[in-house]
Amino acid sequence: MDYSSTINLPKTAFPMKAGLKEKEPKIIKKWEEEKLYQQLRELRKGAPKCILHDGPPYANGDIHIGTSLNKIIKDIIVRYKSAKGFDSPYVPGWDCHGMPIELKVQESLGDKYKETSKFIMRKKCRAYAQKYIDIQRKEFKRLGVMGDWENPYLTMSPEYESEIVEVFAQLVEKGYIYKGLRTIHWCMDCETALAAAEIEYDDNHTSTSVYVRFPVLNKINDKLDGNVDVMIWTTTPWTLPSNMACAFNRDLEYVAVEIDGRYAIMTTSLVDTVLSKKDMKAEGRDMIPVSMEDIEKLEIAHPFIKDRKSAVVFADYVEATAGTGIVHTAPGHGMEDYQTGMNYGLEIYCPVDKAGRYTSDFPEMQGMKVRDANPKVVEILENNGSLYHKEKVTHSYPICWRCKNPLIFRATSQWFMNMTHDDIDKRTVKALDNIKWYPTWGHDRMQKMLENRPDWCLSRQRSWGVPIPAFYCKNCGKTLLTAESTRHFAEIVKTKGMDVWFELEAKDLLPEGTKCECGSTDFDKEQDILDVWFDSGVSSFAAQKTNKDLDGVFPVDIYLEGGDQYRGWFQAAIWPSMAIRGIPPYKELVTHGWTLDEQGRAMHKSAGNVVSPLEVIDKYGADILRLWCISEDFTHNARVGDNMMKAIADNYRKIRNTFRYLLGNISDFDFTKEKIEVKDLLPVDRYALSRLHSFIKVAEKACDGYEFHLFYQRLINYCVVELSATYFDIIKDRLYCDRKDSVSRRSAQTVLVEILDVLVKLIAPVLPFTTDEVWGYYKGENASSVHLELYPKADDNLIDLELEKEWTSILKVRDDVLLSLERARDNSTIGKSLEAYVTICTKEPATKELLTKYEKYLNEIFIVSKVTLSDSKDDTFIEGGVSFVKTEKASHEKCVRCWGHYDSVGTDSEHKELCTRCAEAVR
């Protein structure tokens, strides 16, 4: 008789092949048609809020792998928080203003750019930004990111721009905003000032360094009267025309060293270094100490500008680590130089225009770019005998974040936010202690960046952005910037848009009757715009006003961005918040690392190692990319490449096959009617249920701490080792061969349903497409989405640690049995494990007691036909970790249905080819 039809084989239409590339777009369409995001908002209405505030990506170009990592991790967190019962809306945003877009539009205009008005330029920039907002929105949705995509916050929307101006008004009102002449970082190519957040560093920049003699005009002391120079060292020869002083340090010792018939003053500790540049030594050389009193009365001439003297100043930043211990000081071309110049009343001299060319103030080199000027300056020094030595040095040098070209320091009049007003610097550093940092080192990193930070340069000399709403009296030149005038403009922007600044006259943008102190009502408008970091920095204010789901939520719970944002958005956001609200805008600050190629190299188009997320999705599916995002600790740099994706896809298949096994083996089971009570479950089923709820705790702890890589590792181990290789293996015979409605079979199915229900919910935040598909097969096509479900709760009553401890010991014995079976296969004693009888001699009495307790289940646990426990062993036993095991060929007949070799085979008169269990199952 053929008994194959009596086997309870798994039945499910859930396919083994994922086909994510084809399925995922259909699932997205289904979510949109069902308004899943809106359903979730309605379902969580009134629940505690948990807001992850989106740091706005720049609306320029397609998304890259780093952007994908950022958005996916955010989405996993938001989905997880929603599953935990929080009302966790996700409002995406875009950073729309700024130089990259303006330069792209400028490039597209070509020669017409110079003839294009600011109004037209802004219109084109707006269209360009909107184009990429639409492109990126589609790409983010394809990643499976769920959010309010139809109502994002855009820094170029009238509502948002109005709030930027309103926040600026509050800062004006509180006394934080001022305009002043400062030496700041300047990009000659972009022709604009830059703030600290926009500066990068080239660690391998090569500069021309020069040692220069500045002639001393007066008698210093009885030994030094004529033929004396002050020796300075600089890596920016082009700034020498702007020299106004030589800076000394009162804590250093100075000496005049005879070199080629003249004396050169320098710090004593650097004499050997300076002389070595010319292969000279100090030994036998005349050296005369120079006192502070001598230094204070020095009269120093500029080395090549006639009738200009270089003042003597003192500064703590002058060190004896390099150079000569005397610093060339040009207040118009250095931050420290500027401060020293202010302290000593020096002229803030800067003969360089916005394009980096010398002006008519230095006619000898008028029109020359300063980046090309070093050879000319060196030539002048050589010709007049002032050059002691020149050489190339490699060092770290500031470059523009946008064009990557070297920056200069340039003294210009700019708008600033005062970073010491009302002790905001001290209050902000102290407030860092109230923030949770992931990883924890973020606190110290941020603190170092905030301490002694210079005032925030807010003005930019561009057109695509939010104008600084200041006015200038045409009659007396005084500046008009008040909270009242700024708020008035904010209201105009709210209804008419920001472009009115470029369309209307100043009088139409000011409150009626506005007058200057001189009585004039005639004003000019400021031409500069606000730093775009200010735009995104005030998003915690502005996004609230543009989306009802965020209204009234402050501070938000989470900011999550890459590590570069410590000097960018994280800082830009904290300063306005501390100034206006007195607290940081975020409770938790989470940082992710960079994405690198498989060899750990940075990705560059020129290197041909760029990994496109869209190509990954097209090949593997978004769920595979999402699984990669949690496969490693995202707070560290993450490597990505095709080999890694193949490995991730392999693990995904293991997860998918776990779901397929679960669905297939509960197809004939009605949980509500046929479930077995916990107290009646078979021991291995109770153990599996306990392990499931222990897993929930592990998963929850990992996800609460954003350690998704730990969840991933535990998930793969759970699916592959605990379920597939162990529990599923043990219960397979019972599921397939026990009577369909037997308690033993229903016991296993009861636990399988529990595992499926928990597992699909645990994984849902990470694999939204796959779990949605699984949920449909589990609950039926018309069931509501799994993403509306709550996260599983671990039931402590179902966690039996003593039982888990027992089974840990049993499974160690199982490992020993599997080893013995493998040896028996190798020597052809057996084929399949059911052909084996095993005898076990444990190393510890307690282990035997445990096996005796579960003796009736050992055949099932070890998947053999007979198990005998013995107190003795011989050399036919194989030694394992906790026991000795002997494997023998089964001596009884094989049951043709279950393939076990039992002494009961042939005892049933009706079914002589079956064992007793199988005969009962087929009646």
UniProtKB/Swiss-Prot annotation:
Gene Ontology terms, cellular component aspect? cytosol
How the protein assembles, per its UniProt entry? Monomer.
Its protein name is: Isoleucine--tRNA ligase
Binding of Zn(2+): at which residues? Answer: C895, C898, C915, C918
Which prosthetic group or cofactor does it need? Zn(2+)
**Compartmental location:** Cytoplasm
Record-linked SUPFAM superfamilies = Anticodon-binding domain of a subclass of class I aminoacyl-tRNA synthetases, Nucleotidylyl transferase, ValRS/IleRS/LeuRS editing domain
Q: How is the cofactor bound?
A: Binds 1 zinc ion per subunit.
Give me the gene this protein comes from: ileS
